Amino acid sequence: MSSTEKRLLKEYRAVKKELTEKRSPIHDTGIVDLHPLEDGLFRWSAVIRGPDQSPFEDALWKLEIDIPTNYPLDPPKIKFVVFGEEKIRQLQRKTSSGARKVCYKMPHPNVNFKTGEICLDILQQKWSPAWTLQSALVAIVVLLANPEPLSPLNIDMANLLKCDDTTAYKDLVHYYIAKYSAYESNDV
């Protein structure tokens, strides 16, 4: 087992333990789920909840995580799972008892609306081996509440904040959450 696999296994055990404990601090971070996919430790799936007192509050988003072989020296590639409108309509037609409803578009200045790519310095040049997958997800949740409109991937959302039109920004976020939420897909 490589040092990367050992590190990922250690992180997984820690997160799994915290997620099963009812009073664990992880529940306050916005992380709902984080686990490796069945094909090994180098592809993970996560679900986060939007931060309290933000336009994203109480909505859920799914993320996909690709781990490089030299992790933690290099950062993971984390992006929001986004689907096209047809796929979302198919998911919206499904009803599933017990399944989570997640939003498959992320209307945020620092997230590419079509690809789910995230512009966050700790996922690029400011990455340090001290970061974990869990702490990277917490940073993403914090970014949702504290967008950086000066380094946008979604110019339309950034312009609303640059113009100080927070009402339109919040309304647009709520619109997208309502329009693009569906029962969770197991595709990713």
From Swiss-Prot:
Catalyzed chemical reaction(s): S-ubiquitinyl-[E1 ubiquitin-activating enzyme]-L-cysteine + [E2 ubiquitin-conjugating enzyme]-L-cysteine = [E1 ubiquitin-activating enzyme]-L-cysteine + S-ubiquitinyl-[E2 ubiquitin-conjugating enzyme]-L-cysteine
Keywords noted in UniProt: ATP-binding, Nucleotide-binding, Peroxisome biogenesis, Transferase, Ubl conjugation pathway
EC number, as in UniProt: 2.3.2.23
Pathway noted in the entry: Protein modification; protein ubiquitination
Active-site residues from the entry: C119
Disulfide bond annotation, renumbered to this chain: none
Annotated ranges, domain UBC core: 3-182
Cell membrane recorded as keyword: no
GO MF annotation list: ATP binding; ubiquitin conjugating enzyme activity; ubiquitin-protein transferase activity
Record GO biological process: peroxisome organization; protein ubiquitination
Family: Belongs to the ubiquitin-conjugating enzyme family.
Function (record text): Catalyzes the covalent attachment of ubiquitin to other proteins. Essential for peroxisome biogenesis. Required for UBC4-independent ubiquitination of PEX5.
Name under which the protein is recorded: Ubiquitin-conjugating enzyme E2-21 kDa
Species of provenance: Pichia angusta (Yeast)
Taxonomic lineage of the native organism: Eukaryota, Fungi, Dikarya, Ascomycota, Saccharomycotina
